[in-house]
Amino acid sequence: LLLEGGPLPDLTWTPRYVEIDAPAETLPDLIEAAQKRWPEAVIAARLPLDTETGETAVDLVRRGVRVIHVTGNEVAMDDTGRYLPEAIRDVHGALVDRSLRDAVTLIVSGGIAAAEHVAKAIACGADLVALDFILFVAWGTSLWADRSPSPIEDTDFDAEWGAQRLVNLANAWRDQLLEVLGAMGMREVRRLRGEMGRTIWFETEDAAFKKRLGDSAPLASYPAAAREEAPEGDFRWPVWLLHTTQQMARTGSPPDGHVEYRIGDSDGGFDRLAFTFEMDRDPADVPTADPAGFDMSLPLNRRGDGRPAQRIAAPWYGAGMSYGSVGYPVMYARCRAAMEMGTLSSTGEGGYPDALNEFADHIITQVATGLFGVSEATLQRAPVLEIKYAQGAKPGLGGHLLGNKNTESVAQLREAVQGTSLFSPFPFHSVYSVEDHKKHVDWLKQTNPEAIISVKVSTPTDVDMVAVGSYYAGAHIIHLDGAYGGTGAAPEIAKKNIAMPIEYAVPKVHNFLVEEGIRDEVTLMASGGLRTAYDVAKAIALGADGAILGTAELVAIGCIRVAQCEKGLGCPFGITTTDPEHAKLVDAQESWRRIVNMYTGWLWQIAGILERYGMTSISELRGRSDLLLSLE
């Protein structure tokens, strides 16, 4: 029951919940009267959100109000134009500062339009949310009055159908909220309330990031090459990047500059960064140089601990893709390409197939939380062992392999039951502290005295502390996996909602390692959305030593971003299938040559960037964020 001011109405029924919308000075008296009239009902005060709401809430709680509903507008803003998270944070903070927070239930509404908004509102300080316009959307309303009438205006509206639609929406949101709680290691939503230390605020991170750049420039002033229009691709991989990447994969030559080859069509990330020299250069004039005249190699062991001084010939290697997420021909092609390029490729978390033994010197094998396919024998034959603590596309969640991809050979390698969906737990149940982390690293070092250790983590707000902790635990490589990384199967709410973008994380970690005096004792690798030679160069300029690539290699083979990787026969090109017949669509011999060709084109482009700045080694580019501009 919503009451707008007084006096209280005479009812023939007893409401369960009464909300009073009235001037703040009259609310306590009205609420007291309502409590006497309906003693079994929950009585709440309704307040519009503005800069004074926090103090008003404090006053109401001191005067006995125990439920407060604060409201934003339909686009999740308060009356002053602030977005809902900031407004909620202020109200919650005002109550906490006066030691009153646990004396009141705080309800929030206004523009809550997705499950992620529920989790974020609670993390900012709400106890629960109230839904408004999203209910109309659930019933099929477009929210555009000039487009079509709302189904609820129909005199034949089926109430049971409408109720079931709301139940369906609530169930879907509940499942997504459970994913968030699981990712944060929580079992009760009450623990999420006010957990702002685990939130990432765009304005804060963006301001810190831009301080490290050389300058900014208008986006419209960026001299982009022609951009094609076609249905293939997506915002991060638009058709022009697919086209130029696959052109390099066919020819082994750098792009000709007639089609855009450096940036995609997203509204952030590396698409909003440019090197200073690009701004006054004809995009058709692609800067290239012979990479033979530059030192492109990357040392992986900088600790001087007596283990092999691993060095790869290019500043990147292949990301983890398990047998199960992709088929064997793709695994073969990626490992063969790594051998030809003098770099590495990771098996992912599904085990190390014996058929790849011929590439043993160029393989990273991964130890993830499910321990699928992990054995002493496989650990002892890999030069690099990677502990996968988290993945950028689904931070806080273990790996997923759906049952239709768990074929007989996959199940045999993973020592699992064929046809069942496989979910790696989170976290490692033997690692709950930095000390446990060190024991984990020591276990791998003891198992393989010749291997160097990589630690793969996602990018939470305290990623700099995580990186330093990994260094002191004994890691040689710190692998930061950002939120734009590819994934075959991850909950939608986990993608881009839990961790920060890789371009924010890299300089944050790089500078913290510098301040700790240990930057030159560890190799920092970046992954998660790096698509082009320019992305790699930008990541290095931000502070990474090198990059780790996954999706780009699949695009070189023929991926056009259909985004059905999680399905057994979903990929029309057989790239992400484990079906033995469907996998024959991939020619392993042709595919490894295409990956090598793409990387050859990249080397010429990166050499051109180095030449433009008078550098002779890729290591000279590291940390030169002053050479980057923010495109705004």
Question: Where do the PLM segments sit?
Answer:
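Conserved, well-structured core domains of diverse proteins
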Residues: 1, 182, 187, 191-409, ...
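Short boundary motifs at domain starts and secondary-structure transition points
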Residues: 10, 35, 306-310
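Mobile "lid/hinge" segments at catalytic clefts and subdomain interfaces of large enzymes
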Residues: 125, 135-137, 143-148, 152, ...
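Glycine-rich phosphate/pyrophosphate-binding loop
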Residues: 413-416, 422-429
